């Protein structure tokens, strides 16, 4: 019996470089190496994504309705397209003036008296307060003992860069997204992009398999941390606001899969959400491969969607000394003014990584189904390799897992295509860490493989 090979027949999604399908995002990343024609097409495509121009009545038009050709679009919008993509200073909020509160304490020796609206009194009156009614609507409060107040203030983030979706591209504008957290909005658009990249409608694809042979494998390791979910839930009472009935369910890390099943595919087959820090995409792929290779699944939608660019997530990771900081970049670059475009430096002289948001999906089939349907095959998955790090003093420190899983992957490739192909006709496409400790071990793994 021949072993089933899971193959990639479609891919799509969105990140800071733009749309993934048909390599738009990749072309933006390597734009300085493109031919003039490819560069022009990439700029025009991104200008459309960013809402600078649109395709209407078989012509490109700007927001004022003026008809433009590709050359004019490049001349007019190239700088804006390039500066509004990839890693850049945070645009979602003002990272230099993040709203917050300053705790102020009045010592017990000094009583404090103030007037306030009666309706603004807390439900549970502090024990140190004496409340005197002045009218039907006003009271006077006198404090006896130490009293604390939270006063509206602002603070500055130490890390001010992120990999954000292109400026002007707002997922919520493309469908009815009321109450949906940003990460779920991105999941809806990302999976649609992947499915449409196949070139065969989902209705036609699903006719060739039974419902139980379709699987959706998707998750979000952080869950949803925006105001519509955990972000709003955890801050509501501290801000004097109420929680909503949607914040808890929409925050769950399985929601990307649930949204895809319910709002995109109408899937009644298998569904699964697996997470594992920055390896979550690998974990979802591993789950899909397991089911395809066993014959349980023949058509799978696989991916993840994350939208963690919030002040709280930035602060939390900065407190771990994980994120690149302004002071850190000044130190290693020897400059006063930091270029946030250069904040992420995998395998280079760096001082941390950057936050990013992205929605990335692939569509997998078993090789027999792909050949039957005549789909384009972009690649295959002979296997996935995952190893834990064993005992170590710090959970975020490097461990032997990198060496073990990578050596297993290379060994699998050697068995599949032979030593000569690996030496002369292969390359390693690596995700590089921007943390000083991990970059050393990851570089070591790649060096050993090259040798």
Where are these regions (language model features)?
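Structural signature of cysteine-dependent C-C bond-forming condensing enzymes
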Residues: 1, 199-215, 232-245, 262-270, ...
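Short, well-ordered amphipathic alpha-helical segments that serve as non-catalytic structural scaffolds
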Residues: 186-199, 254-257, 284, 366, ...
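Condensing-enzyme catalytic core mediating Claisen C-C bond formation in acyl metabolism
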Residues: 2-16, 23, 27-31, 328-421, ...
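ACP-dependent fatty acid/polyketide chain-elongation machinery
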Residues: 1-173, 368-380
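Conserved catalytic cysteine-centered active-site region
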Residues: 43-49, 90, 138-185, 223-287, ...
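Active-site-proximal alpha-helical scaffold in enzymes
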Residues: 186-200, 253, 257, 271-306, ...
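Conserved small-residue
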Residues: 191, 216, 281, 288, ...
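Acyl-CoA/ACP chain-elongation machinery
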Residues: 296-351, 384-398, 432-439, 451
